[in-house]
């Protein structure tokens, strides 16, 4: 059975934002603050390190009621028994991912505009990550910012919940939620925060109030 998931506050990891802090500690604090969906995004780790880190995170977040999805790497997700996989437009096709992971794991897909949101209709995915909403330096190949209006159009086209990503902060989170987003995907707003738990708690409150 596919796990229930709460996309209200979705942490996307970036060890480059941690200023030397331990990733598991930051993730644990963020989950304690209300991030109930976590994506492990590791572009530089070797496969063995990736699997070991993913396995440790599964053991950390699952007892706390959160879910872990793996960015891009279906093999890593299966090896560590993660809750799902998140893919981008240049990764494996969603139908192929679904065939590998089966019906009982989560599958997310990134979309960067209306055309991709429209093309995602009918795909076997559980949610879309839409953005960047605002200009971001976290992901160099993120594409042009779509703004609130672009987000609204992507949400209107979607058949599944849409999580907004791309320089979403406490200052603009309410507007993002008011646009109809199912949740906020955060990278630096939590990973780079001096107190990840407090940052997550503040963002969680804003997200829930913004619905």
UniProtKB/Swiss-Prot annotation:
<protein>
    <recommendedName>
        <fullName>Thiamine-phosphate synthase</fullName>
        <ecNumber>2.5.1.3</ecNumber>
    </recommendedName>
</protein>
<feature type="binding site">
    <location>
        <begin position="39"/>
        <end position="43"/>
    </location>
    <ligand>
        <name>4-amino-2-methyl-5-(diphosphooxymethyl)pyrimidine</name>
    </ligand>
</feature>
<dbReference type="InterPro" id="IPR022998">
    <property type="entry name" value="ThiamineP_synth_TenI"/>
</dbReference>
<dbReference type="InterPro" id="IPR013785">
    <property type="entry name" value="Aldolase_TIM"/>
</dbReference>
<dbReference type="InterPro" id="IPR034291">
    <property type="entry name" value="TMP_synthase"/>
</dbReference>
<keyword id="KW-0460">Magnesium</keyword>
<dbReference type="InterPro" id="IPR036206">
    <property type="entry name" value="ThiamineP_synth_sf"/>
</dbReference>
<dbReference type="GO" id="GO:0005737">
    <property type="term" value="C:cytoplasm"/>
</dbReference>
<dbReference type="GO" id="GO:0009229">
    <property type="term" value="P:thiamine diphosphate biosynthetic process"/>
</dbReference>
<feature type="binding site">
    <location>
        <position position="91"/>
    </location>
    <ligand>
        <name>Mg(2+)</name>
    </ligand>
</feature>
<dbReference type="GO" id="GO:0009228">
    <property type="term" value="P:thiamine biosynthetic process"/>
</dbReference>
<feature type="binding site">
    <location>
        <begin position="136"/>
        <end position="138"/>
    </location>
    <ligand>
        <name>2-[(2R,5Z)-2-carboxy-4-methylthiazol-5(2H)-ylidene]ethyl phosphate</name>
    </ligand>
</feature>
<comment type="function">
    <text>Condenses 4-methyl-5-(beta-hydroxyethyl)thiazole monophosphate (THZ-P) and 2-methyl-4-amino-5-hydroxymethyl pyrimidine pyrophosphate (HMP-PP) to form thiamine monophosphate (TMP).</text>
</comment>
<feature type="binding site">
    <location>
        <position position="167"/>
    </location>
    <ligand>
        <name>2-[(2R,5Z)-2-carboxy-4-methylthiazol-5(2H)-ylidene]ethyl phosphate</name>
    </ligand>
</feature>
<feature type="binding site">
    <location>
        <position position="139"/>
    </location>
    <ligand>
        <name>4-amino-2-methyl-5-(diphosphooxymethyl)pyrimidine</name>
    </ligand>
</feature>
<feature type="binding site">
    <location>
        <position position="110"/>
    </location>
    <ligand>
        <name>4-amino-2-methyl-5-(diphosphooxymethyl)pyrimidine</name>
    </ligand>
</feature>
<keyword id="KW-0784">Thiamine biosynthesis</keyword>
<feature type="binding site">
    <location>
        <position position="71"/>
    </location>
    <ligand>
        <name>4-amino-2-methyl-5-(diphosphooxymethyl)pyrimidine</name>
    </ligand>
</feature>
<feature type="binding site">
    <location>
        <begin position="187"/>
        <end position="188"/>
    </location>
    <ligand>
        <name>2-[(2R,5Z)-2-carboxy-4-methylthiazol-5(2H)-ylidene]ethyl phosphate</name>
    </ligand>
</feature>
<feature type="binding site">
    <location>
        <position position="72"/>
    </location>
    <ligand>
        <name>Mg(2+)</name>
    </ligand>
</feature>
<comment type="similarity">
    <text>Belongs to the thiamine-phosphate synthase family.</text>
</comment>
<keyword id="KW-0479">Metal-binding</keyword>
<comment type="pathway">
    <text>Cofactor biosynthesis; thiamine diphosphate biosynthesis; thiamine phosphate from 4-amino-2-methyl-5-diphosphomethylpyrimidine and 4-methyl-5-(2-phosphoethyl)-thiazole: step 1/1.</text>
</comment>
<dbReference type="GO" id="GO:0004789">
    <property type="term" value="F:thiamine-phosphate diphosphorylase activity"/>
</dbReference>
<keyword id="KW-0808">Transferase</keyword>
<dbReference type="Pfam" id="PF02581">
    <property type="entry name" value="TMP-TENI"/>
</dbReference>
<dbReference type="GO" id="GO:0000287">
    <property type="term" value="F:magnesium ion binding"/>
</dbReference>
